[in-house]
Amino acid sequence: MSRSGVAVADESIQAFNDLKLGMKYKFVLFSLNDAKTEIVVKETSSDPSYDAFLEKLPENDCLYAVYDFEYQISESEGKRSKIVFFTWSPDTASVRPKMVYASSKDALKRALNGVAIEIQGTDFSEVSYEAVLEKVSRGAGSH
């Protein structure tokens, strides 16, 4: 239960585990139910295109997402993968949803074990492939 009193639906945890363990999905979108009492699965996708993920982010509404982000630092190191947690709260969204999503985020994050990186997006430049790549690769290869 979050500070806002919002709970995380079991289906949300299951969808995340299907992404993380079963590699069933490439990304999962989460939203608040109509009563604003529970974080539920809005959509799942196995589409490997990052652009397909970005197209699902609404211009005027908030949501959460997890994305199995694959990247490569150098040819010699091969591909890597990190699970990225997004809080999408565009500047154009109404104030009330932004407040509810901000205060409910920790409940969802706590329920999703295995998230490597968190990204807060208020516009598309903050969630671009390049911006996410920079964040996930920071420190990688320096171990």
Swiss-Prot record:
Ranges of residues in domain ADF-H: 5-137
Gene that specifies this protein: COF1
Keyword tags: Actin-binding, Cell cycle, Cell division, Cytoplasm, Cytoskeleton, Nucleus
Pfam families: Cofilin_ADF (PF00241)
PROSITE patterns cross-referenced by the UniProt entry: ADF_H
UniProt similarity note: Belongs to the actin-binding proteins ADF family.
InterPro entries linked to this entry: ADF-H, ADF-H/Gelsolin-like_dom_sf, ADF/Cofilin
Protein name, UniProt field: Cofilin
Biological processes per GO annotation: actin filament depolymerization; actin filament severing; cell division; endocytosis; Golgi to plasma membrane protein transport
Sample GO molecular function, one term: actin filament binding
